[in-house]
């Protein structure tokens, strides 16, 4: 065995992708050679003109591999890995169960058994759904391969050094290999942003995804300070500051006065209209929305939001940058909340309503994780920042009504200084040094003045939260926020961790059916109020389905 049972099984079960340097480090491959001499080196290995192929390096590794071949230990190891996988996948992926079964059985004709298993899984519904999502993902990346209007991008500036600004700077340097300048009036914030980038790059080195020699090359691409440096040298300026229209307009003015006439200004706003932000610009055709999601290095979806007078060259250059950063672009209509947050926020709020109704934080998050989400809704609120979410609600409520009304007692959380991961205080407790989520902060119930009763079944919690999301997704189609449902499916998977094996938000909507959704929403209206009122698009589609079935 090259890497042993444990490592090999974990790679198979997670579907982990492995770069060549990581593969060399793990022992999956023997050598990395230049393309020009690849054939010759391969021949040397075949004919024995080189040292023996990679073997176990030390006595400890030999002992580990020998131990893994002991029957009782092998069985114990597989059971432990099975428990780990179940905690993450919750039996939602048939392939994981099939792989574990094959490893347990250890048949004599193992290759034949694996081939039969693969053939069955390939025809499975989950496999077809996953392949469709991946195919659409690739299409979204490649449909913009010929961006003739984009021009060359040589340097990027980021305004704001918070988690968002730091994340944008990191992917610009690490993935796009572009120089990036972080500007912020707070020097400490800039230092934290630079440190975050260094830690993320260091992690890439540890995982074998980045050669150590390139770490310093990447980190030297990032600079920061209180002022712009490099007269007229930024091709794109990305603002990642808090939601204040006047502030964003002032930043446009400052950037326009400093940089060239063709410099693009990209706003990372959550709720403000891009047209409003651009209304006082000298060159509104250069203003566009480019909306990332926290944590930027993990959430690969980026919304591209042009307003009515945004030029095609600006759109092309924004899309080009996003693709170079390794992200997936989604063109959306200029409307508060855009697409991802528009469907995400009602789902998050409903989870909070469940807390107010006496459900435990851990129970709610676990129920949605068993449904297939990579992270529970309340943990996601902590990631987003409770203060940011609450500040966005009044604007969204004015535009879309009571579905976005601030729930009761949210002020209690703000007064208790609970902003989530960024200040280590939220629905969860966080490690003081690493910032990793540890456990539910049970004092949250006292702050909200509630008693945990856990009256709801997990299925009821899931139904309440998912119905709000499905209804809002239908509103987005009704209002032409997006026009392609397949792209909406990929966006929901990449942007908010909607279960990939369910095919995305619109695939799941079609699976349940508009008739069922409308009926359940009307029942929820009776139980919980008007926020569950089904949208016209759903009602019309339900009527059409009923008529077709008659």
Per-region residue spans from a language model:
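N-terminal glycine-rich phosphate-binding loop for ADP-containing cofactors
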Residues: 1-550
């Amino acid at each position: 065995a090259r890497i042993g049972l444990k490592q090999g099984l974990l790679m198979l079960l997670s579907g982990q992708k492995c770069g060549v340097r990581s593969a060399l480090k793990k022992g999956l491959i023997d050598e990395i050679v230049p393309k020009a001499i690849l054939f010759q080196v391969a021949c040397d290995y075949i004919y024995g003109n080189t040292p023996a192929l990679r073997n176990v390096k030390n006595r400890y590794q030999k002992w580990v591999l020998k131990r893994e071949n002991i029957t009782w230990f092998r069985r114990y190891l597989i059971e432990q890995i099975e428990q780990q996988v179940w905690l993450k996948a919750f039996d939602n992926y048939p392939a994981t169960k099939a792989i574990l079964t094959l490893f347990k059985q250890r048949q004599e004709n193992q290759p034949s058994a694996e081939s039969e298993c693969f053939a069955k899984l390939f025809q499975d519904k989950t496999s077809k759904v996953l392949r469709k999502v991946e195919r659409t993902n690739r299409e979204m990346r490649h449909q913009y391969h010929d961006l003739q209007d984009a021009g060359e991008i040589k340097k990027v500036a980021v305004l704001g050094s918070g988690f968002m600004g730091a994340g944008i700077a990191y992917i610009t340097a690490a993935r796009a290999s572009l120089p990036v300048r972080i500007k912020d009036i707070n020097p400490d914030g800039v230092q934290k942003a630079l440190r975050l980038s260094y830690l993320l790059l260091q992690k890439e080195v540890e995982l074998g995804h980045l050669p150590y020699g390139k770490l310093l090359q990447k980190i030297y691409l990032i600079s920061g300070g209180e002022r712009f440096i490099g007269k007229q040298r930024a091709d794109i300026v990305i603002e990642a500051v808090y939601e204040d229209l006047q502030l964003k307009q002032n930043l446009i003015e400052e950037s326009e006065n400093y940089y060239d006439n063709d410099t693009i200004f990209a706003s990372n706003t959550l709720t403000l209209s891009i047209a409003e932000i651009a209304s006082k610009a000298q060159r509104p055709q250069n203003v566009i929305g480019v909306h990332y999601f926290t944590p930027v290095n993990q959430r690969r979806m980026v919304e591209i939001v042009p307003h009515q007078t945004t030029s095609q060259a600006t759109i092309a250059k924004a899309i080009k940058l996003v693709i170079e950063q390794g992200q997936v672009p989604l063109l959306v209509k200029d409307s508060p909340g855009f697409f991802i947050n528009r469907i995400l926020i009602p789902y998050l709020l409903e989870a909070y309503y469940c807390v107010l109704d006496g459900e435990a934080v851990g129970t709610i998050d676990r129920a949605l994780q068993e449904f297939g989400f990579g992270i529970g809704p309340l943990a996601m609120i902590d990631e987003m920042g409770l203060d940011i979410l609450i500040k966005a609600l009044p604007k969204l409520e004015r535009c879309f009504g009571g579905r976005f009304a601030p729930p009761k007692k949210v002020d209690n959380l703000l007064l208790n200084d609970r902003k989530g991961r960024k200040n280590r205080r939220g629905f969860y407790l966080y490690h003081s040094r690493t910032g990793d989520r540890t456990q539910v902060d049970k004092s949250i119930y006292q702050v909200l003045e509630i008693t945990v009763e856990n009256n709801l079944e997990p299925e009821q919690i899931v139904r309440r939260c998912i119905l709000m999301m499905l209804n809002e997704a239908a509103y987005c189609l009704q209002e032409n926020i997006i026009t392609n449902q397949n792209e909406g499916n990929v966006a929901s998977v990449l942007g908010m961790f909607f279960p990939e094996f369910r095919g995305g938000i619109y695939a799941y909507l079609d699976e349940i059916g508009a008739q069922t959704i409308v009926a359940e929403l009307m029942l929820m209206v009776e139980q919980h109020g008007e926020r569950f009122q089904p949208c016209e698009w759903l009602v019309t589609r339900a009527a059409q389905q009923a008529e077709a079935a008659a």
